[in-house]
Design a protein with these regions (language model features):
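The feature marks the mature, well-folded catalytic cores of soluble enzymes
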Residues: 1-168
């Protein structure tokens, strides 16, 4: 609710141009998608299809909403990469980030003993097969997985991918 409040306040103050459109029937937090601004949106199925978000919509219906409301031509769904301790149900911005020149930064794991190793390896395979809305493959840059961090014995979903990008 506070996320929406800041948007309404900024719009009311004239910071955003155009008409305010409210979509109260669809849950889409900021970190749940990445967009290149050229028609491609990245997301994870575990996040947008979580029971606490857009049920009872099917994945095809969610994709249709994203394409219509975000003017996207292609939605790239990743089925892997949810981190232990992640309370966002797998926001894309903790594991994969879009960068200029059709580049994706992504979290990799080299420790075969890490419980996240297999899932992050499967994510890497999906990334290698992914293309943008124009059918171009991505240039991939792998970020290391930081050493495990714990809070009261619970693993935290720490990565180097979850950062703020400011353009301009």
């Amino acid at each position: 609710d506070k996320d929406n409040l800041i948007n309404r306040t900024l719009f009311g103050d004239g910071v955003f141009a155009g008409e305010r459109v409210a979509y109260d029937d669809f849950v889409l937090e900021g970190g749940s998608i990445e967009s290149d601004g050229r028609g491609t949106v990245l997301t994870t199925s575990v996040c947008l299809m979580a029971p606490n978000r857009n049920q009872p919509l099917s994945q095809a219906e969610v994709e249709k909403v994203l394409k219509e409301r975000l003017c996207a031509r292609k939605i790239v769904w990743f089925d892997h990469g949810q981190l232990i301790g992640d309370d966002t149900d797998g926001h894309i911005d903790t594991i994969v980030r879009l960068c200029p020149d059709n580049t994706l930064l992504y979290v990799g794991c080299d420790d075969e003993n890490d419980p996240q190793y297999a899932d992050l390896h499967a994510l890497e395979q999906q990334l290698k097969a992914a293309t943008d809305a124009d059918g171009k493959p991505y240039r991939l840059l792998r970020l290391p997985m930081p050493d495990a961090l714990y809070d009261d014995g619970d693993r935290l979903p720490a990565t180097y991918a979850n950062f703020l990008i400011i353009n301009g």
